[in-house]
Swiss-Prot record:
It is a peripheral membrane protein. It comes from Shewanella sp. (strain MR-4). F-type ATPases have 2 components, CF(1) - the catalytic core - and CF(0) - the membrane proton channel. CF(1) has five subunits: alpha(3), beta(3), gamma(1), delta(1), epsilon(1). CF(0) has three main subunits: a, b and c. It is found in: Cell inner membrane. This is ATP synthase gamma chain. InterPro entries: ATP_synth_F1_ATPase_gsu, ATP_synth_F1_gsu, ATP_synth_F1_gsu_CS. One of its GO terms (molecular function) is ATP binding. Produces ATP from ADP in the presence of a proton gradient across the membrane. The gamma chain is believed to be important in regulating ATPase activity and the flow of protons through the CF(0) complex. GO terms for biological process: proton motive force-driven plasma membrane ATP synthesis. Belongs to the ATPase gamma chain family. It holds the Pfam family ATP-synt. Its main location: membrane. Keywords: ATP synthesis, Cell inner membrane, Cell membrane, CF(1), Hydrogen ion transport, Ion transport, Membrane, Transport.
């Protein structure tokens, strides 16, 4: 058994760690609330844009934009949104596992793939994973702007426009609630057709000034908005996962302190008993 002094030092060390994890939990909780506000503010726009584009994809247009045409998938692109920092449980690991499984299924069909990682952890993973990394972004902070992502997204759009990509997906952690964050893969291109019940009534739009000018701008903005929504959802998921992880670490530290305190008390009791035995033995000898 370790000496009482060593155990006492260990207890002090664990208490210091507990203070750090408790502070990180509170910081993550505060950041999560702000991230939720940003996510809630951008979600209606992203969902409305997705709905409109879904109906456009179902419509009977004279001008068929390349983003509406389904072609054989020879090369697949992924925009993978992960975190810049760690200490957020299995958030990134679960996301990467989902991407790897999807890549494997495409690989079995003979398709090649390339990546556009967003977030330092995503960049680090995919540079060592294999496959081409066409563009990347990191250090976006807790309140990213759409302008921070446009350059990175355009690289993948240009590749699609040039026929270098036949499918484009965005991958991120969808925020469900504080305890649940789900990794999702959403198709960006070609445009997925709406699954809305209203699709049975088919919406046909009248375009001003003309379909080509409008769709060329609208469809690019659609892709950018979906990637941005994925980023803000992932940030909210990150802060929620970090808050939960730090709370678990704080609770575990408390349990460890209690266990060490018990060991310390036993060691101190044994030391006192030993000293008393030596005193009694010495007195008997005299």
């Amino acid at each position: 058994m370790a000496g009482a002094k060593e155990i006492k030092t260990k207890i002090a060390s664990v208490k210091n760690t507990q203070k750090i994890t408790s502070a990180m939990e509170m910081v993550a909780a505060s950041k999560m609330r702000r991230a939720q506000d940003r996510m809630a503010a951008s979600r209606p726009y992203a969902e409305s844009m997705r709905k409109v584009i879904g109906h456009v994809a179902q419509g009977s247009l004279e001008y068929k934009h390349p983003y509406l045409e389904v072609r054989e998938a020879k090369r697949v692109g992924y925009i993978v949104v992960a975190t810049d920092r760690g200490l957020c449980g299995g958030l990134n690991v679960n996301l990467f596992k989902k991407v790897v499984a999807d890549v494997k299924s495409w690989k079995e069909q003979g398709a090649e793939f390339e990546f556009c990682p967003i977030g330092a952890r995503s960049v680090q993973f995919f540079k060592s994973f294999g496959g081409q990394v066409s563009a990347h972004a990191s250090g976006l902070g807790d309140a990213p702007k759409l302008a921070d992502l446009i350059g990175t997204v355009r690289v993948m759009l240009d590749a699609y426009n040039e026929g270098k990509l036949d499918r484009l997906y965005v991958v991120f952690n969808k925020f469900v609630n504080t305890m649940t964050q789900t990794p999702v893969i959403e198709q960006l291109l070609p445009l997925p057709k709406s699954e809305d019940d209203e699709v049975a009534h088919r919406w046909d739009y009248i375009y001003e000034p003309d379909p080509k000018a409008l769709l060329d701008t609208l469809l690019v903005r659609y892709v950018e908005s979906q990637v941005y929504q994925g980023v803000v959802e992932n940030i909210a998921s990150e802060q929620a996962a970090r808050m939960v992880a730090m709370k678990a670490a704080t609770d575990n530290a408390g349990t460890l302190i209690d266990d060490l305190q018990l060991v310390y008390n036993k060691a101190r009791q044994a030391a006192i008993t030993q000293e008393l035995s030596e005193i009694v033995s010495g007195a008997s000898a005299v």
